[in-house]
Amino acid sequence: LLGTQTPTHGNIVVNNNDITALPAYKRSKWISMVFQNPAHGTAPELSILENFRLASLRARKKKLSIGINNDFRKTVEEKVASLGMGLEKKLEQPMGSLSGGQRQALTLLMGVMDKTDILLMDEPTAALDPKSSQVVMQLADKINKELGITIVLVTHSMKDALHYGNRLLMFHGGAILRDLNKTDKSALQLSNLQEWFS
């Protein structure tokens, strides 16, 4: 989906567009990414506000010299306040001084700042403590339900996959073992998973 690897065969179609034939800047209009490590995808030496501006400029292919106006600051304050972490009062604080959970939650917000269609999340809770993991997953669920953004989540947490996913693809050794929709998942028992991998 990101276009970093060429498919061995077939095409990847998003919004009736073959994205394998599109340049990266056009794919970036539809797809945003949240990395496993909260430090990736952000500039730790820049403030929270500057990181939001950088993410917005990248999404719009604008020059990085454009300043931060009051409207942009207000928009960021409102979005960050919705997290309930009090970070809207610390927008000048360097991103690198925040906890992993705080950075990952902010990275999620940055990924949807300019209304993407698809948000790719590569094990976004792998480096987080259980409480921060729950905050990040609940935020992702809210983004999906309230903004209608499709989330492709890569996770080793069957609990998260079963709880938050509408469709579940189970991989092993590079092959799809199971393709389940929400109805199929309701009958799925975690105790049955081991036999699928044997």
Task: Identify the function of each model-found stretch.
Residues G10-D18:
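Conserved ABC transporter NBD signature motif
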Residues D18-S32, K62-S65, N69, K185-S191:
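ABC ATPase NBD coupling module
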Residues L2:
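Helix-to-loop junction immediately C-terminal to a conserved catalytic motif
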Residues L46-R58:
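Q-loop/switch helix immediately C-terminal to the Walker
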Residues T155-H156:
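H-loop/switch region of ABC-family ATPase nucleotide-binding domains
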Residues G111-V112:
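ABC ATPase C-loop
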Residues A175-S198:
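Conserved beta-strand-loop-alpha-helix hinge in the C-terminal portion
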Residues L119-D122:
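Catalytic Walker B motif of ABC-type/P-loop ATPase nucleotide-binding domains
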